[in-house]
Curated annotation (Swiss-Prot):
Residues 46-56, 120-140, 205-287, 344-377 are cytoplasmic. The gene is Gpr27. It is a multi-pass membrane protein. Belongs to the G-protein coupled receptor 1 family. Expressed as a 3.0 kb transcript, in whole brain, hippocampus, striatum, frontal cortex, thalamus, pons and hypothalamus. A lower molecular weight transcript was detected in all regions examined, except the hypothalamus. GO terms for molecular function: G protein-coupled receptor activity. The chain crosses the membrane at residues 25-45, 57-77, 99-119, 141-161, 184-204, 288-308, 323-343. This is Probable G-protein coupled receptor 27.
Amino acid sequence: MANASEPGGGGGGAEAAALGLRLATLSLLLCVSLAGNVLFALLIVRERSLHRAPYYLLLDLCLADGLRALACLPAVMLAARRAAAAAGTPPGALGCKLLAFLAALFCFHAAFLLLGVGVTRYLAIAHHRFYAERLAGWPCAAMLVCAAWALALAAAFPPVLDGGGADDEDAPCALEQRPDGAPGALGFLLLLAAVVGATHLVYLRLLFFIHDRRKMRPARLVPAVSHDWTFHGPGATGQAAANWTAGFGRGPTPPALVGIRPAGPGRGARRLLVLEEFKTEKRLCKMFYAITLLFLLLWGPYVVASYLRVLVRPGAVPQAYLTASVWLTFAQAGINPVVCFLFNRELRDCFRAQFPCCQSPQATQATLPCDLKGIGL
């Protein structure tokens, strides 16, 4: 959106420097997004310990962010160069609609996928047996991925069917809305806000669930009912029945033990969520919620600007705020690998195992056998 300056004036150098800085920043975002997302995708594919449903969903999210950066950021760079050129032609209406469709598609895919991830995280903590039996494998992850892409495809069509062209070089890859307050644009914004809000409500419900069970209740001994040495009732441990079955008891047959689950190697014999599994699931919840919160923080300013443009008037939003909000959406395409690396210790360990050259000398020394350490190696 650079204005043409007078020849020989001092504005040309400043505009050229601003254009160079903008193109360099976009190139850096493109490289970081592609390198980080492709690296994490390869790490999840190669490491067998990561072949679980949460990491399959993370793999799809990384691939979608990489595709968004590859499809959108070069187009924005080309639009910026065309706008800065003296005889540059603006991008066509078809190209703007295609880029707006791709941006809306990837945005809604991330929103719907994060909603599905939030629901599965809640089930993994609150209903662990059901999650372990029905939702822990790859079929559930494949269904969630397909559903997220299908819903995103259905939601991305309406905003670009009748929309106009882009009005600045930052807009082709942003969620272009019709500036006349059309119901399609307003419905698009309401749907996005509803999906993101529902995702945070799921995590809020999960937080309340963990808070209510943060401390174990003290065990209360309930005395068993005893008649002629047959113990039954809430406090019975079943030892009397076991003794009678083994032939050590006398008297009448003890009552049937109600509520005791038979132990066995089958799928129904899986225990409840133990402490180590709970810590693992909790770390995954923290990582995915950090991704969800950053999605809200980086897309929120642009959604607010779009609301103002739709409900008030197109010129109600300052151009500086609109440009900054669009650049925040660009940064969202490359921030997820950094968040995953910071919040997930399992991913860091797998990364060090796959790439030993990235380990520090202290970590390499810690992995040496004791006899090698003793001789100074």
